[in-house]
């Protein structure tokens, strides 16, 4: 057996051959051999061939790798792996360096482009610059040399420049609205925002589009680019749920307070509504409140507070129809009802059992309020939990802080509304049981 040498691999020494202690014939017969060589005494007596075979050592096989060779092989493998890792890191660093150089190059190109655009726009207003300089003060002349440099915005803001210098047409976006200090002194009360003869704006109307169409343009104004369509630039549609909720709450107060004396109340007072009018008005109000709750703008804390107050007022009117006394005996009820035409939906509720029939009528209507209170309570609970994501308001600004009302106020409204409904239902049931 010869030893083989490879490049970089040490030579493997072949161990000497060791013969077995007994011959092959004695080993097969399991007899003790005299170990005489070349022929033992037993093989001589029997006349058989005596053959000594090589001894087979237990453990590693002949020609296996030695410990030093294995350690050398493992060392070479680890070195190759480390070289590959270093190559990967080097390639990653090269790619990152190229990306950073490309980003810096793009940044420089963008800066150069902005600088060129600024220098191109600066001399495009030769006529307006002297007028601006002349309006800054008496010491400045329009014929003074013009020095180009960074603009002084503080000076522009401090100087009394008239807006007419900018050649912008005077557009009246909201006709009849004068924002001077004199008008702010006599600012009207909130109920005057919604005149009784003016219809309530619907969701499909667009105030901005109408104002652009109706705004007058002076004849001597320079040519301006056409105003883009509001709906084409992605402006959110205007929603009128909040003024609609205010109108609903205002219409639930047809009778003026006895302690309130104003010129409008002295001129004439409206007659109290009938039972039929109260029932019809409450049904319509509940439908309107349901539509407002289903709208996305009901996430606003102010809107949901107003419709909750309207729901309280609906319960108060139902309590008045059912002849339920107010909470405080000293307070005067604002819900006055004309009970003379006591006919509701073809039923005559006049007579001795008028109170019982009115209570049954209100009890049959409370399922609408119960369904509304469930939806409203869920909406109020969502407001209190604050688990809704930030949304875009009608102005297009991220309205993540639109929960401006205290959480405990909304939570208290939800609890009180449910308690008021349960109290009214239990009082009506007790009255019907007493007969």
Curated annotation (Swiss-Prot):
<dbReference type="GO" id="GO:0008270">
    <property type="term" value="F:zinc ion binding"/>
</dbReference>
<feature type="compositionally biased region" description="Low complexity">
    <location>
        <begin position="130"/>
        <end position="147"/>
    </location>
</feature>
<dbReference type="GO" id="GO:0043455">
    <property type="term" value="P:regulation of secondary metabolic process"/>
</dbReference>
<dbReference type="Pfam" id="PF08493">
    <property type="entry name" value="AflR"/>
</dbReference>
<dbReference type="GO" id="GO:0003677">
    <property type="term" value="F:DNA binding"/>
</dbReference>
<keyword id="KW-0479">Metal-binding</keyword>
<feature type="region of interest" description="Disordered">
    <location>
        <begin position="117"/>
        <end position="147"/>
    </location>
</feature>
<keyword id="KW-0539">Nucleus</keyword>
<comment type="function">
    <text>Transcription factor that regulates the expression of the gene cluster that mediates the biosynthesis of monodictyphenone, a prenyl xanthone derivative.</text>
</comment>
<dbReference type="Pfam" id="PF00172">
    <property type="entry name" value="Zn_clus"/>
</dbReference>
<dbReference type="InterPro" id="IPR001138">
    <property type="entry name" value="Zn2Cys6_DnaBD"/>
</dbReference>
<keyword id="KW-0238">DNA-binding</keyword>
<dbReference type="InterPro" id="IPR036864">
    <property type="entry name" value="Zn2-C6_fun-type_DNA-bd_sf"/>
</dbReference>
<dbReference type="InterPro" id="IPR013700">
    <property type="entry name" value="AflR"/>
</dbReference>
<keyword id="KW-0862">Zinc</keyword>
<dbReference type="GO" id="GO:0005634">
    <property type="term" value="C:nucleus"/>
</dbReference>
<dbReference type="GO" id="GO:0000981">
    <property type="term" value="F:DNA-binding transcription factor activity, RNA polymerase II-specific"/>
</dbReference>
<dbReference type="InterPro" id="IPR050675">
    <property type="entry name" value="OAF3"/>
</dbReference>
<keyword id="KW-0804">Transcription</keyword>
<feature type="DNA-binding region" description="Zn(2)-C6 fungal-type">
    <location>
        <begin position="23"/>
        <end position="50"/>
    </location>
</feature>
<keyword id="KW-0805">Transcription regulation</keyword>
<dbReference type="GO" id="GO:0045122">
    <property type="term" value="P:aflatoxin biosynthetic process"/>
</dbReference>
<dbReference type="GO" id="GO:1900815">
    <property type="term" value="P:monodictyphenone biosynthetic process"/>
</dbReference>
<protein>
    <recommendedName>
        <fullName>Monodictyphenone cluster transcription factor</fullName>
    </recommendedName>
</protein>
């Amino acid at each position: 057996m010869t030893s083989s040498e490879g490049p970089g691999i040490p030579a493997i020494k072949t161990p000497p051959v060791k013969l077995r202690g007994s011959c092959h014939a004695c080993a097969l017969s399991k007899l003790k051999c005299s170990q005489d060589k070349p022929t033992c005494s037993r093989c001589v007596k029997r006349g058989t061939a005596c053959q000594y075979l090589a001894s087979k050592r237990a453990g590693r096989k002949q020609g296996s790798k030695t410990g030093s060779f294995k350690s050398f092989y493992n060392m070479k493998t680890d070195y190759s792996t480390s070289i590959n890792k270093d190559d990967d890191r080097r390639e990653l660093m090269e790619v990152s360096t190229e990306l950073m150089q490309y980003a810096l190059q793009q940044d420089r190109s963008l800066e150069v482009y902005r600088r060129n655009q600024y220098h191109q726009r600066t001399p495009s207003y030769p006529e307006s610059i002297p007028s601006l300089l002349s309006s800054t003060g008496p010491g400045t002349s329009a014929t003074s040399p013009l020095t180009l440099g960074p603009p002084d915005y503080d000076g522009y803001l401090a100087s009394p420049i008239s807006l007419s210098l900018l050649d912008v047409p005077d557009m009246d976006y909201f006709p009849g609205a004068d924002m001077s200090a004199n008008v702010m002194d006599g600012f009207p009360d909130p109920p005057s925002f919604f005149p009784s003869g003016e219809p309530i704006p619907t969701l499909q109307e667009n105030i901005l589009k109408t104002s652009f169409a109706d705004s007058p343009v002076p004849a001597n104004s320079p040519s301006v680019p056409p105003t883009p369509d509001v709906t084409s630039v992605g402006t959110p549609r205007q929603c009128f749920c909040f003024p609609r909720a205010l109108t609903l709450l205002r219409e639930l107060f047809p009778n003026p307070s006895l302690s309130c004396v104003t010129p409008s109340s002295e001129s004439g007072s409206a007659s109290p509504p009938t039972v039929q009018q109260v029932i019809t008005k409450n049904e319509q109000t509940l439908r309107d409140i349901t539509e407002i709750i289903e709208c996305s703008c009901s996430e606003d804390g102010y809107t949901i507070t107003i419709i909750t107050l309207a729901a309280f007022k609906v319960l108060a009117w139902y309590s008045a129809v059912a002849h339920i006394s107010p909470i405080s005996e000293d307070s005067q009820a604002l819900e006055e009802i004309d009970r003379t035409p006591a006919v509701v939906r073809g039923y005559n509720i006049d007579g001795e059992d008028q109170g019982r029939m009115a209570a049954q009528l209100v009890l049959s209507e409370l399922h609408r309020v119960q369904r509304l209170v469930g939806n409203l309570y869920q909406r109020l609970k969502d407001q209190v939990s604050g688990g809704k994501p930030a949304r875009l308001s009608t102005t297009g600004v991220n309205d993540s802080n639109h929960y401006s009302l205290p959480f405990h106020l909304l939570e208290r409204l939800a609890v009180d509304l449910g308690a008021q409904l349960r109290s009214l239902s239990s009082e009506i049931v007790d009255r019907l049981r007493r007969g």
